[in-house]
Amino acid sequence: MKKLFVALGLVMGGLHVSYAEPASAQQVPGYYKHQFGNYRITSLLDGTIYLDPKLFKNLSQAEKTKILTKYAAVNEKGIQTSVNAFLVDDGKSLTLVDSGASSCFGPQLGSIAKNLELAGYQLANVKTVLLTHLHPDHVCGIAKDGKAVFPNATIYAHEREADYWLNPASEKTVPANQKENYLGTVKNIKAALAPYEAKKAFKTFKDGDVIQGFEVINTQGHTPGHHSFRLKSKGQQIVFVGDIVHSHSLQFDAPKTGVDFDVNSEQAINTRLKMFAEISNKQQWVAAPHLPFPGIGHVYKVNAEQYQWIPLYFNNSLEK
């Protein structure tokens, strides 16, 4: 018996000595499935970025700090922001709303395609990609190394959005201090769309259109052709809002807070106020690319001036 205890002691001691920290700090795959009526919506995480608080306008630094402290969102790296996309499965076809940044914003983003496959889907089976607008963190994910990531998909953007970024005449309307950023964005957009334009798989839509059951909603301001998409099923509604909001803390508590990269700040703020009021009043679901992953939830009206983001409750199995 004594020999047994000695042997066990040696074994346990060996286990203690050989223990090592995990080699990777990577989290679990970034996808979450949500059953919305007859549709299965899979949130896909592209990654996380940090925005400089100075990018948010109409609030003093003291006011920003107060709100961020209230929501335990103070971070020396900046204001944490998710980049999400949403895959909608109607049982017959797959529609992707926005596509992430691929490599356009560096290595911290670019996981949409990988997470889509980890969720059990195939890139070749995506038939439609709806783009709320053409900023790189929404369009770059459709291509990689000059090739289509979704080889059988048709890409859609609003006609005004396409005109603003792809019509050479639009450059003349851009202020001189913004022209460099504008031209850099145009370069990324053209590179992303090129493999689809080559096979005539890039199309534009207009106000009032319905694409694969998605109703087009005019939410311009962030960009001239920014649009959201509404889907209805079994008495419920969900709105894929795009970039009407970039911070779950600042812009719900103070919705008149703009961001520096809104093309038309006043219009973007008015759009946000209108959409927050409508979404909260009708208790619509929201799917948002820049709210904390999985980016699905509701908007609650606190008072005449403030709102609150209510994320969905995590469920370890799909409810039918």
Residue ranges and their predicted role:
Residues 20-27:
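Cleaved targeting-peptide boundary
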Residues 21, 110, 117-121, 125, ...:
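Metallo-beta-lactamase
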Residues 91, 107-156:
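Active-site metal-binding motif and surrounding structural segment of the metallo-beta-lactamase
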